[in-house]
């Protein structure tokens, strides 16, 4: 899917993003994410341009070199997925004398922040700030820097100024505070639709401008939001959304495979990795992970969609309506 955003969408989003995070012309941004990704383009290019500041880019992310580069360039803040800061903290833990000389704020998107990671970063003088959003609804929820230590991963944040967020039930009604429902948002930052996909656009974006994220959350009396699940069958691997159903569809026809069900398995570095449960055609000769990868490679399926672990099972449990339990 290709999300369409206007110039005004992007400019509003980045102006409120930099303002609420207290960024100024004197700040130096480090961007390890690819510039063809929303994170890299919005925050690595547009934000520094609007501030009149500097951006430091790294062609291929290598944690030790990244730390040295940031120190040499006086980097003060960064924005990327959790694995980037996770890897750099591992380097700092392993090497005496190496530190973040100037980095003070690292914004993390793509997945909730574990409290233990926030505490590790704080020991090196860095605030980890959780950011929530998507390409369609650019970052629109954040933890204010002054609240990072206090909230310590308990909340995904509050909406940026000028952006509305609601939590609704299956019927589209707003739920009481503290009750779980689907997160929806609207504002000047919102995309205008998917390129050449009218039906998909209509499912995601209603006539009043609300975007239906498919993410589950709850909101407290102060308007703080906690993302705590997903309606959609999505695996968040290193900040990238991967469709579990797409992986199972790609595996259809693989030799020795009768059925499969893919889920995200917890991972300390990436948040989740791809785990596929496999029902073999012949229990005496189940396919291996290498067999499945070879099949996907032959079909030119992107490597990011390859199972990273498989589990052989007798059958996949389903509900009365045929949905995987």
Task: List each language-model region with its residue ranges.
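Conserved AMP-binding A3 loop
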Residues: 1-15
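Short beta-strand->loop structural element characteristic of the AMP-binding/adenylate-forming
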Residues: 2-4, 31, 53-60, 129
């Amino acid at each position: 899917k290709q999300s369409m955003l206007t110039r005004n969408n992007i400019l509003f989003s980045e102006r409120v993003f930099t303002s609420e995070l207290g960024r100024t012309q004197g700040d130096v941004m480090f961007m390890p994410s690819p510039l063809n990704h929303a994170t890299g383009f919005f925050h690595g290019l547009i934000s520094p341009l609007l501030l009149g500041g500097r951006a430091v880019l790294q062609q291929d992310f290598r944690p030790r070199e990244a730390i040295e580069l940031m120190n040499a360039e006086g980097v003060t803040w960064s924005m990327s997925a959790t694995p980037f800061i996770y890897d750099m903290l591992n380097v700092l833990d392993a090497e005496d004398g190496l530190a973040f000389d100037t980095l003070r704020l690292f914004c993390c998107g793509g997945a909730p922040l574990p409290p233990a990671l926030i505490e590790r970063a704080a020991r090196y003088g860095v605030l980890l700030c959780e950011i929530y959003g998507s390409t369609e609804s650019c970052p629109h929820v954040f933890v204010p820097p002054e609240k990072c230590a206090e909230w310590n991963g308990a909340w995904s944040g509050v909406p940026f100024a000028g952006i509305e967020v609601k939590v609704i039930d299956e019927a589209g009604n707003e739920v009481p505070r503290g009750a779980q429902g689907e997160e929806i948002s609207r504002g000047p930052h919102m995309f205008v639709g998917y390129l050449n996909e009218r039906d998909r656009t209509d499912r995601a974006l209603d006539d009043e401008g609300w975007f239906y994220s498919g993410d589950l959350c709850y909101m407290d009396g102060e308007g703080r939001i906690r993302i705590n699940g997903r309606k959609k069958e999505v695996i968040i691997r290193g900040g990238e959304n991967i469709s579990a159903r797409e992986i199972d569809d790609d595996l259809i026809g693989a030799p020795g495979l009768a059925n499969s069900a893919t889920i995200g398995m917890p991972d300390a570095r990436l948040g989740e990795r791809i785990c596929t449960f496999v029902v073999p055609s012949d229990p005496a000769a189940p396919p291996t992970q290498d067999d499945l990868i070879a099949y996907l490679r032959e079909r030119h399926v992107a490597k990011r969609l390859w199972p990273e672990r498989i589990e052989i099972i007798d059958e996949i449990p389903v509900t009365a309506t045929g949905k995987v339990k």
